[in-house]
Curated annotation (Swiss-Prot):
Top-rank taxon, per record: Eukaryota
Name used for this protein in its record: Ubiquitin-like modifier-activating enzyme ATG7
Family per record: Belongs to the ATG7 family.
Residues annotated as catalytic: C565
Location of the motif GXGXXG motif: 385-390
Pfam family, any one: ATG7_N
Gene: ATG7
Gene Ontology biological-process entries: autophagosome assembly; autophagy of mitochondrion; cellular response to nitrogen starvation; piecemeal microautophagy of the nucleus; protein modification by small protein conjugation; protein transport
Amino acid sequence: MQYTPFASDIELPFYTSLASLKINHDKLDDSARKLLGLYEIRSTDRPEASCRMQIHGTALTRDEVPFGYYRAEGMIKNVNTIEEYHNIDRNALLLQTGKMIWDAINDETIYSCPSLLVSFIVLSFADLKKYKFSYWFAFPAIHSAPSWTSVMDPKPLTGNESSTLVDAVQTWRYGVDARQHGFFLARKDWHVVNSPSDGTVLNKAHVDNQQSLSPIAKELGFSWKISSISDFETGFFHDALPEDCFVCFADPSNYPDAPGWMLRNLLVLVRQRWKLNEVYILRYRDVQSKRDQGRSVVLKLRSDTAHLDPNDSRLGSQMPMPKVTGWERNAAGKLTGRVTNLTEYMDPRRLADQSVDLNLKLMKWRISPNLNLENIKNTKCLLLGAGTLGSYVARNLLGWGVRKITFVDNGTVSFSNPVRQPLFGFNDCLGGGAKKALRAAAALEEIYPGVDASGYVLSVPMPGHPITDASKAELEFKELKKLVDEHDAIFVLLDTREARWLPTVMGKATGKIVMNAALGFDTYVVMRHGVENCSAPETELGCYFCNDVVAPADSIKDQTLDQQCTVTRPGIAAIASALLVELFVSVLQHPDGPAAPASIPKQESRTDHPLGIVPHQIRGFLSNFSNVIVSGKSYNCCSACSGNIMDAYKNHGWDFVRKAVNERNYVEELSGLKEVSLSLKKRVVIGTKFHRSSV
């Protein structure tokens, strides 16, 4: 006998499902998982394209069998390295799956799940960086020794025989589990008919009510009776002639003389369980829509073994398992696995989405399993400043998977910018220079199309810089306020101290996460601003201005060129930006979010938090390559976050901002800094007088 081996046929969505399962659930666990295989009878397929084992996109998660399909019981072992894929003991895998079939035959569990006769195993490795999937299917077939041979020419069913058989099989299937559908018993129950061999009249299972028979059944002279294979042992074929008893299987093979691969295991059941050395096999190849075509074929098979004694203990469960084969050959006919490169089929944007997330999700495999990546991904970030700090911060946010980034800047790209600001190039400087905010947003989308990036050309009102166009300034203030309200985190990355004042006020008033970075020549400060805590105001962390004794003012007036420009060591912006984003992500991972207390390094370990400590400020000194972690409380006379400033902003909005910008001492008087300054001066005067009187 020749048999048609299965050919694996994997739907593309399955690879995505496998990748998702590996990244998000299995991680380093390479235990074998259940896999639903499906095969079907397709009369229109060429013989060489038939007998396909289909793996649908939901094969890992669903257990239902679609109408018209037959079930196969599969397992997939997705290993962690390509070396393990190549070096694993494949023979042991095959034998393990074959033994499962052998044991099920011997202990009768095959009767509750005949689809085990169509078991398979898949060895795979998913290269999730390159989206290349290496895999190798094995369809275990237990050898029959000696082999079975055909002792008569294959006999196709007639159209009428096929039609009535299909109806009987369909009726039987409605009452049994899908695991039974692929294998069944069929028996001809004759009415009073003439035997086709000698013309004598035989009474076989006489049907009392001849009127209930269909016209085709009356013409044939018999009816089909269908039952599960377990009924062989309860006498389903009792008193029936051998030529009227058929062991049937759904055969997806379209070769006329080569039945499907599963027949090999079915014949092991016939010999090992039923002790038969001669059997009529029915290759069931008909479908409901074409049931009169008569494609099903009857085979008479015989094993050239000696008479099988049912009492021979060697034929029981103690009999050694026969040889097992079944590894699939590739398209070239070689005994080796296959490789699918999914990048050839995937939408480049979708591929980028999954690749961006890959490295982040790998962190959860071993290093930080409690990392909340969705929280990071869904945080909307507003970057005030699209220059050196803004460019580096944006790139680091992309690396962490942030999808919404908005720039605010009123500057243009100059020729000195591209070498220090990685979102810009030489062409952006031409024609007077592109607007930084707009070009930075466009550059992010060029880097990663999945990001939602936008830019706004706005000027931020600053104390010490009187307003010249009140209507324009008010519109820009309202636009900035709207952006602050729409975002979850504000990154203050502007050039001057006074430019940071209004964003600090807005962020504190709205309870947003405010992240701040500022640079010196070889120093930097990276910090998070505190948020309002009504229940424990004494625990509030300070903002960028909480250590000041004067309100911000025009810091570039009367300054020389080297004082007006941000003159820093070129690498310091990248260092500060990276620390700022890492601090931001640590804040998001803390249960208290922006209200997280300042960590004390010596008292906390990494195990207390998915990413380690959550400091308030990091002050860096590049001259000796050191960092100092600092914590500061909120100051009740702060020019940006004190109670008086918050109340004035919340109650008066633009009118407050306009006065703060235009009136020189307004902020100091409102916050209480003016009074503090006068008090200090009085103390100095008193101290001086006391010193002189003592002398």
